[in-house]
């Protein structure tokens, strides 16, 4: 009794909500063995036959290829595709593929040479000695993908399972009507299928391996039981026929009683599922060393005279397979790739067979019936009762029709497996699956756009942060450069400080002037000349090397200027000799000397700052002649007019007015923009100003006394 209960508990199965029981229509094709189809003259191999990006091309137009030779390289989720036969690559161009939209995808076209020669095959009969990574890499590089319809790369799926897989499930349910590819494969190749299952179990090391098969396949069940008679590591579970018990989530719940969480995967609960055809492809890749170049395809429907299952090479045009099966086309003939519930109608028949093609259904007009007209939803809830995913199809229908993407997402439209059970039972003939497919595609497109926008925003913010960092670093460099002057600037600052200290030391010494003696201004003159020399040196450094050449000095003009200077000097000596020698106030003399030095220094700075312009010889000669005429006139007037006594008050007032005007002129000169000045003319004016200043000072002293 205990053994009976133990056996009952071991073989226990569960059920799932919803589901339907449509006509099976499997006897049309499952009664005949697998057969080979003659090679097509031309093969069309799409580069993308799986979930993920297409691989990188490794052949060119004109290359000769052998069967099993890689046409692309697979990295990551990029699964390679292989040549289905030997021949020549005649084109690499977009071509319509097996998809409801019939969009063109990049494909390799090969003209078969009829020899069907293989590449050199290297099988691993001792796969038990190979590491897990080696086996997964071989499976991936040999192009094995899920052959149950999803097309997910098998190597990636095995790699993602890791060590957390406790149960390996082999899906042999094949629940959709008309399709018998897995049923016939298990009948004819049961031993190879079981060997592939053992390879998968060796890679994953699960606690248990379960094969789930519906009870409407008695021949396949008997063949598997015969192969597994002495095996204790693989358990066969026969489940009731119910659509869609072959769905991944539904079969997981039937065999384990566990439900895959919303938005999750079966691996989250320790379960990994593979298809029967995938297990057979794994065996051929590992043990036989053959990449996947063909698969079993069901050819069925009343429009086919020879229904059955065939070994179809990947890339074979659909029209070639149907013609081999005795296809009788009509004006309104439809051909469905897949089953009647989850398949799609082909727009034309030159579409190639790919890895996920398991059935080609060519029904007659009476077999499928007329397509009823879509009517309004009556809220009968029949779709909700039939939904195996516990969704509310009527609500999802309204959300999809009203473009309410947020509400559709909140009602778990992503969990819809598109089995078509809701549309099958709908009394209003609403194509619910089409609405759901379109809504999921729109939601996916919106999510991709939001992802791209977020990535663009992140790139913009990163750029702004980088610019801010660069700006802060630039300001810091400028700040450090301003705080630490260059060595040349430091030398100039030190020289200026030394000059200031020297002047302060000279100013502290008392100035002693004896009456009757001429002041000794040799030190002041020497210092002035030194400063002028420094200014000229600095000006010479600042002038670029590419300046215009200095024009030669006119000797006549120089002689005239020298004569004028000598005449003024004689006149000044005569006036000094005529006037009585009086004692000079030392403080006043020191102040006047300081003022003269300041003015001279300012004049030198202006002269050094202003650019030197070329002197017009004619203009200089005219100015010299005018100056000589004015000098003669002043000498004649001074000799003719008698010397009058000078009013001290009036002289003082005039001196004050002169000083005020001088200050005003200095302020205006500082405020107004500097104009180019002739350096020679400026020097003459400065000399005249100094003479006039000395004369005014002497007159003021006389007036005060």
Curated annotation (Swiss-Prot):
Recorded protein name is Ion-translocating oxidoreductase complex subunit C
Q: Which domain of life is it from?
A: Bacteria
Q: How does it assemble?
A: The complex is composed of six subunits: RnfA, RnfB, RnfC, RnfD, RnfE and RnfG.
Its record classes its membrane topology as: Peripheral membrane protein
Role description: Part of a membrane-bound complex that couples electron transfer with translocation of ions across the membrane.
Quote the record's binding site residues for [4Fe-4S] cluster 2: 387, 416, 419, 422
What are the boundaries of the region Disordered? Answer: 536-684
Give coiled-coil spans as residue ranges.
Answer: none
Q: Which GO terms describe its biological process?
A: electron transport chain
């Amino acid at each position: 009794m205990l053994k009976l209960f133990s056996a009952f508990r071991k073989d226990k199965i569960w059920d799932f909500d919803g589901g339907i029981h449509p006509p099976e229509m499997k006897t049309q094709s499952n009664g005949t063995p697998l057969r080979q189809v003659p090679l097509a003259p031309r093969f069309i191999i799409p580069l993308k036959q799986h979930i993920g990006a297409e691989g990188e091309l490794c052949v060119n137009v004109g290359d000769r290829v052998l069967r099993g030779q890689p046409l692309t390289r697979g990295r990551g989720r990029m699964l390679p595709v292989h040549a289905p036969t030997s021949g020549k690559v005649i084109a690499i161009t977009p071509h319509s593929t097996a998809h409801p939209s019939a969009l063109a995808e990049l494909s390799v076209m090969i003209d078969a040479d009829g020899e069907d020669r293989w590449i050199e095959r290297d099988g691993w009969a001792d796969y038990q000695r190979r590491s897990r990574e080696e086996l997964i890499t071989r499976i991936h590089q040999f192009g094995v993908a899920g052959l149950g319809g999803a097309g997910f790369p098998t190597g990636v799926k095995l790699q993602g399972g890791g060590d957390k897989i406790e149960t390996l499930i082999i899906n042999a349910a094949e629940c959709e009507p008309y399709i018998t590819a897995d049923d016939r494969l298990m009948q004819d190749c049961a031993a190879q299928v079981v060997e592939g299952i053992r390879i998968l179990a060796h890679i994953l090391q699960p606690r248990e391996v379960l094969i789930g098969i519906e009870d409407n396949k008695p021949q396949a069940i008997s063949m598997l039981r015969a192969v597994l008679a002495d095996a204790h590591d693989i358990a066969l579970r026969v489940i009731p026929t119910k659509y869609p018990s072959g769905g991944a989530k539904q079969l997981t719940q039937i065999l384990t009683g566990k439900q895959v969480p919303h938005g999750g995967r079966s691996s989250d609960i320790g379960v990994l599922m593979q298809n029967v055809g995938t297990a057979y492809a794994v065996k051929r890749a590992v043990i036989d060393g053959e990449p996947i170049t063909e698969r079993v395809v069901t050819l069925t429907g009343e429009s086919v005279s020879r229904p059955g299952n065939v070994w179809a090479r990947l890339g074979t045009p659909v029209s070639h397979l149907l013609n081999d099966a005795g296809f009788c086309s009509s004006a309104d003939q439809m051909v469905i790739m897949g089953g009647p519930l989850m398949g799609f109608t082909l727009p034309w028949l030159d579409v190639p067979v790919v890895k996920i093609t398991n059935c080609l259904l060519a029904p007659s007009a009476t077999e499928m019936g007329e397509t009823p007209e879509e009517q309004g939803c009556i809220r009968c809830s029949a779709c909700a009762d039939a939904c195996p995913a516990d969704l509310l199809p009527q609500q999802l229908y309204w959300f999809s029709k009203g473009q309410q993407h947020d509400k559709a997402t909140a009602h778990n439209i992503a969990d819809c497996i598109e089995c078509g059970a809701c549309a099958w039972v709908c009394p209003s003939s609403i194509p619910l699956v089409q609405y759901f497919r379109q809504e999921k595609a729109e939601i996916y497109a919106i999510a991709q756009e939001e992802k791209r926008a977020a990535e663009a925003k992140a790139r913009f913010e990163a750029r702004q942060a980088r610019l801010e960092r660069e700006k802060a670093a630039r300001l810091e460099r400028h700040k450090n450069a301003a705080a630490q002057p260059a060595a040349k600037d430091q030398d100039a600052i030190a020289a200026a400080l030394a000059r200031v200290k020297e002047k302060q030391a000279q100013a502290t010494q008392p100035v002693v002037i004896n009456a009757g003696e001429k002041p000794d201004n040799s030190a002041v003159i020497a210092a002035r000349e030194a400063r002028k020399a420094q200014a000229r040196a600095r000006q010479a450094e600042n002038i670029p090397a590419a300046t215009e050449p200095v024009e030669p000095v006119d000797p006549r003009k120089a002689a005239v200027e020298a004569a004028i200077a000598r005449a003024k000097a004689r006149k000044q000596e005569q006036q000094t000799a005529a006037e009585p020698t009086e004692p000079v106030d030392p403080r006043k003399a020191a102040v006047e000397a300081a003022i003269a030095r300041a003015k001279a220094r300012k004049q030198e700075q202006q002269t050094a700052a202003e650019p030197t312009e070329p002197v017009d010889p004619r203009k200089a000669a005219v100015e010299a002649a005018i100056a000589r005429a004015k000098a003669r006139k002043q000498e004649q007037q001074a000799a003719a007019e008698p010397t009058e006594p000078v009013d001290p008050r009036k002289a003082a007032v005039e001196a004050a007015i002169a000083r005020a005007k001088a200050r005003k002129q200095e302020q205006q000169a500082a405020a107004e923009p500097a104009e180019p000045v002739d350096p020679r003319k400026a020097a003459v004016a400065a000399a005249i100003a100094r003479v006039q200043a000395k004369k005014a000072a002497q007159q003021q002293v006389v007036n005060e006394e």
